[in-house]
UniProtKB/Swiss-Prot annotation:
Origin: domain of life: Bacteria
Organism listed in the record: Lacticaseibacillus casei (Lactobacillus casei)
Top EC category: oxidoreductase
GO biological process terms held by the UniProt record: inositol catabolic process
Coiled-coil boundaries: none
Pfam families tied to this protein: GFO_IDH_MocA, GFO_IDH_MocA_C
Catalytic activity field: myo-inositol + NAD(+) = scyllo-inosose + NADH + H(+); 1D-chiro-inositol + NAD(+) = scyllo-inosine + NADH + H(+)
InterPro entries: Gfo-Idh-MocA_inositol_DH, Gfo/Idh/MocA-like_OxRdtase_C, Gfo/Idh/MocA-like_OxRdtase_N, MI/DCI_dehydrogenase, NAD(P)-bd_dom_sf
GO molecular function, one term: nucleotide binding
Name listed for the protein in its UniProt record: Inositol 2-dehydrogenase/D-chiro-inositol 3-dehydrogenase
Function field: Involved in the oxidation of myo-inositol (MI) and D-chiro-inositol (DCI) to 2-keto-myo-inositol (2KMI or 2-inosose) and 1-keto-D-chiro-inositol (1KDCI), respectively.
Pathway linked to the protein: Polyol metabolism; myo-inositol degradation into acetyl-CoA; acetyl-CoA from myo-inositol: step 1/7
Similarity section: Belongs to the Gfo/Idh/MocA family.
Amino acid sequence: MVVKVGVIGTGAMGRAHIDRLTNVLTGAEVVAVTDIDHEAAEAAVRDFHLNAKVYPDDTSLLQDPDIDAVFVVSFGGAHEATVLKALDTDKFIFTEKPLATTLEGAKRIVDKELTKSKKVIQVGFMRRYDQGIRALKEKLDTGIIGAPLVVRASHINPNVASNYSNEMAITDTLIHEIDEMHWLLDDEYTSIQITYPRQSAEVRNEGLHDPQLATLTTKKGTVIQVLVHVTAQYGYEVKLEVIGETGELQLPNYGLGPILRSNANQQTAVEMSWINRFIQAYNTEVQEFIDQVAKSEPPVGPSAWDGYIAAITAAAANRSQKDQETVLINVAGTPTFYQNKNAIHA
């Protein structure tokens, strides 16, 4: 079966997904696109040589009975409304993060999906598909370093767009680590605190504090510290270190070429964009989603519930930004519907 896909949003990320669906992966065909910028949608069809319809909006695209799955790749504030409308159809849904920009919006999506016969939503938390992070989790799960005691991570960007706000340090940047650590440790958060170190002189965005340090605690007692530094200038990096009872696991910043040692110096390249760093992870997550849709089986990747957990934690982090105090996190138990990766209602 060739999965027929409609893409909602043809900006940079939408075009990247169209490219991989059309030219890199197997089993899918982009048959419809839409964007609030109609010319951008037309350009995507033209540039990628698609045999696809261009719809004026998401509502009309979602009414197309020939579409098996939709990719929601619009700006974050539009995700909730589109996903809720998509849940009124029989289509599978791949939505980029965030699931919704508010806690209440994420809860509305979860509540609506719970009325369906099976899971249909996958959220684009691609970190789970990174080969290095997966390998680290596999090692951790063997118990080779004992129980995880402390996790240290960094999320470094060279710079950010002029519309990047202080809140987006959480909802656009830290959100990746929020989901990653929840999955990596198989644990629930109990609190989060955001603190502001010395302000970087490189910050140009009004109201933005950079860097920021997030400290999270979990039910099992692990303490997680994440440095978010989005005006670092020198490049893009993610770092991860897990300190256990009997050892440590570290994620190398791999894939950037050889390390050169010469004339008493050591050099290696530093990536400037997250796109190249995680291209393999994006390809793997989308291929897995397409393969599940082709079998008419529920997605096995990050679920709407995972998106809801991330939204709860992000909302607490945004509150902590205001006074840099610790904010408690209390999440109800995971519904049975979301406990089984292949959850289907009887």
